[in-house]
């Protein structure tokens, strides 16, 4: 994936959200309304994959994330397909092989 800032649609069987992600030197960091995603893209050319960790954060009564309310979730193993600055990352979690996750990412700016 090209280094930069991406507009991302995050989707699972249980949830869907819009967010942003940054990619730099293969490192992926993303956030939406309820989760933080971080990990690494691996491989070259058509053999690109990603391993991401996903953290769900709780919301305080104010609507702000509680720093100590982070809840760990399993690692995601994703295949990456991309054309013209758009990427689709899709796969499952280590804990639930039947679960499906999909991230549709569109490049918007340099870092």
Predicted regions and their residues:
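Tryptophan-anchored aromatic micro-motifs
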Residues: 1-15, 89-91
């Amino acid at each position: 994936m090209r280094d930069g800032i991406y507009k991302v649609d995050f989707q699972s069987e249980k949830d869907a959200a819009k967010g942003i992600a940054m990619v730099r030197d293969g490192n992926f960091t993303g956030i939406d309304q309820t989760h933080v995603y971080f990990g690494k893209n691996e491989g070259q050319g058509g053999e690109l994959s990603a391993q991401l960790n996903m953290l769900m954060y709780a919301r305080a009564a104010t609507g702000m994330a509680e720093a100590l309310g982070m809840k760990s979730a399993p690692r995601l193993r994703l295949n990456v397909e991309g054309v013209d600055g758009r990427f689709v990352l899709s796969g499952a979690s280590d804990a639930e092989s039947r679960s499906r996750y999909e991230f549709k990412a569109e490049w918007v700016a340099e870092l």
